[in-house]
Regions:
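N-terminal export leaders
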Residues: 1-6, 12
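Charged, low-complexity intrinsically disordered segments
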Residues: 15-141
Length: 141
């Protein structure tokens, strides 16, 4: 029994140092104070307006502890009908960081839609690198 206690202590000590891999099954990046997904930006507007557009409090949809905001009722209805299409890939984590083995929340202002899927990035140059070779990042993430 002492061995297992020692092993548990060692694992507890090194666990935070191990890189964390996120997958598409990870929760959506959410503001811990407001509960808003992707900082309240409208995920549908990236597709319909080709723009990062702040959602409005009167057009919200909630589920699984996450609140999504939308620019209008039409965008809210589209998202509710097809969240798998409009929700950010990798839960909104930056795929270029996932390739390096770390999770870093994407910034909704740095984005790209490729292959009819939304990807968020934490830096502009990460978005540019991804856009230049999306296949590489998607196979490695």
């Amino acid at each position: 029994m002492a061995f297992f206690g020692l092993l548990a202590g060692i694992l507890a000590a090194i666990w935070p140092a191990l890189p964390v891999r996120a997958t598409t099954s990870e929760r959506v990046v959410t503001n811990r104070y407001s509960g808003l997904a992707i900082e309240g930006f409208d995920p549908v507007a990236y597709f319909t307006d080709a723009a990062a557009t702040q959602g409005r409090p009167e057009f919200e949809a909630a589920g699984s502890g996450v609140v999504w905001r939308f620019r209008n009722e039409g965008n809210r209805a589209s998202f509710v009908a097809h969240p798998e299409i409009y929700g950010p890939q990798f839960g909104g984590y930056d795929p270029t960081d996932l390739v390096r083995g770390v999770t870093c929340a994407g910034n909704p202002r740095f984005w790209v839609v490729i292959g009819n899927r939304l990807y968020l990035f934490n830096r502009e140059h990460s978005r540019d690198a991804f856009a230049a070779d999306p296949a590489r990042f998607l196979t490695e993430a």
